[in-house]
């Protein structure tokens, strides 16, 4: 499975480049390019139409409404569908309202969909949602995704903790893990992600052992990372579900003491309030 190069292809994002009128054209072409590559692969390859967030804030703090968000996503979804994608892939969502809009847009487009959120603030999304809350929300949707999970965030170890949070809910829905290749660092005039292929291979194996069904890489992930991940998954036997201690030992420490779930959830919230003060 791979994604089309259309992450920022909705009207709200293209408006920043005065290109909001080209949603149909750009997404259709992006989907066609992906379809062409997949069909030449010599093996089954699923083309997922990448759809990122609108970048807008929902009412009452902002101006975005549910109806408008659905309209924005539906326009992009129809263009990706016309270009030949197999599935819609919403990612890096932080607001539950936007995730619900994605579900309704996919239903309107009559397309299967997957949806991931980005957990990057003490194990929560930017809008405060925990892994447990997301899993609960997904099952309450009229049009739930065929798979759900987490992408991006602040590194593989934090993403793995989020994955364990999904698994702890007992969900039977396939889980997605799409972690960054390490942490971004500024070096010699450009941003460099410090995750090695070896680290991403460890992450991929641990994600599989944790019960994840769809494993990939987000920011900073290069062909050499993906190659190492695939070799590790194909050559290493399945193991037990990793503990938090094992994750930290192999992938590095967590960025916060709490992920907002479990016995330490209250402590995690108090710590964040203290830091803001």
Each predicted region: which residue ranges?
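Domain-level signal for soluble alpha/beta catalytic cores
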Residues: 1-277
């Amino acid at each position: 499975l791979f994604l089309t190069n259309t992450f920022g292809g909705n009207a709200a994002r293209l408006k920043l480049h005065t290109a909001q009128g080209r949603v149909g054209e750009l997404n259709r072409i992006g989907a066609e390019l992906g379809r062409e590559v997949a069909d030449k692969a010599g093996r089954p390859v699923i083309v997922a139409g990448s759809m990122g967030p609108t970048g807008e804030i929902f009412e009452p703090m902002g101006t975005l409404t549910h109806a408008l968000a659905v309209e924005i996503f539906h326009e992009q979804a129809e263009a990706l569908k016309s270009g030949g994608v197999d599935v819609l892939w919403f990612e890096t969502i932080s607001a539950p309202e936007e995730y619900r809009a994605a579900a309704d847009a996919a239903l309107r487009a009559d397309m299967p969909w997957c949806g991931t959120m980005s957990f990057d603030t003490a194990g929560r999304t930017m809008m405060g949602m925990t892994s447990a809350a997301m899993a609960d929300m997904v099952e309450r949707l009229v049009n739930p995704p065929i798979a759900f999970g987490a992408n991006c965030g602040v590194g593989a170890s934090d993403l793995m903790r989020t994955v364990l949070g999904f698994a702890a809910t007992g969900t039977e829905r396939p889980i997605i893990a799409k972690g960054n290749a390490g942490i971004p660092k500024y070096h010699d005039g450009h941003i460099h992600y410090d995750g090695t292929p070896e680290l991403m291979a460890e992450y991929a194996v641990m994600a599989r052992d944790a019960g994840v069904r769809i494993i990939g890489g987000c920011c900073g992930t290069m062909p050499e990372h993906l190659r190492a991940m695939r070799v590790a998954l194909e050559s290493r036997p399945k193991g037990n579900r990793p503990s938090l201690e094992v994750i930290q030992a192999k992938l590095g420490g967590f960025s916060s003491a709490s992920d907002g779930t479990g016995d330490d959830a209250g402590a995690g919230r108090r710590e964040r309030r203290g830091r803001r003060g």
